[in-house]
Amino acid sequence: MQDDNRFLKINFEEPKNSLNQNTMDAVHVLFYSEKNVLLSQGFQEDKILSSFLKNNIIINSSNYVIVRSETGTFLLVRRKLQKDVGFTSNYLEELGGNIYNSLKSIGHSIVKIYEEEAEINLRIALGILLGSYNFSNYKKNKSKEKNTLNNVIFL
């Protein structure tokens, strides 16, 4: 008998006009550029949330920032622009793996990634899948780390 929770489900959905925060168990992944400009679209209507996220981008200098607020949990990810040197498929796959590693043990089961470009979504999804693979079948001492992440949605 197979355990369905060991598989990571990846869905691609149509982007909505506003950020849907009805899912309390979801982490919203938003991208911003190296010049601290928010790249993810679809939530500018909420001015308070938009300014809150922009302030967190400016304050934190790291590439991955987890922000919790009353409107939800957000992972702010710094990434290169398509025209930048080093923006390759390998870069996006590593970015996806780093996103997975940042979120795998924080207790949320759903991740919503806000990126409109299909090719970028494809490479990030591959990176998430590669990052989610564990070698537990080949280890003598199995890890006790609990992974709760089981659903990734690209919007």
Q: For each of these PLM feature ranges, what is it?
A:
Residues M1-L155:
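Short amphipathic alpha-helical segment within the helicase RecA-like ATPase core
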